Amino acid sequence: MKFVLLFGVLLVTLFSYSSAEMLDDFDQADEDELLSLIEKEEARKDCIPKHHECTSNKHGCCRGHLFKYECQCTTVVTQSREETERCFCGTPPHHKAAELVVGFGKKIFG
């Protein structure tokens, strides 16, 4: 009888320890996931929207429907005949074509 009682106490102790470890792992995973979501949300707030200037931050454009917008630059001649580079976030032509094909496919195949 003492052996069964000792074995039962040992089994309950091991079970509670293993379940506590599993809960700690789940809590850590939840915290990591929450921090990841917060970081992504902050990155979205800091990104440059479509058609806005990205001359100083060429890699900071936001995401579009399917692709991330790209910083597209052009050379502008000012009234004083100086050439300056102006950049804006936009969708490149090959991304526009891909979005058109995907949209067309969604309309046909539902």
UniProtKB/Swiss-Prot annotation:
Belongs to the neurotoxin 19 (CSTX) family. 03 subfamily. Disulfide bonds join C47-C62, C54-C71, C61-C89, C73-C87. The keyword Protein transport does not apply. One of its GO terms (molecular function) is toxin activity. Expressed by the venom gland. Residues 21-44 form a propeptide. Keywords: Disulfide bond, Knottin, Secreted, Signal, Toxin. Pfam families: Toxin_35. One of its GO terms (cellular component) is extracellular region. The lineage of its organism: Eukaryota, Metazoa, Ecdysozoa, Arthropoda, Chelicerata. Residues 1-20 form the signal peptide. The presence of a 'disulfide through disulfide knot' structurally defines this protein as a knottin. Its main location: secreted. It is found in: Secreted. It comes from the Eukaryota. This is U1-lycotoxin-Ls1cc.
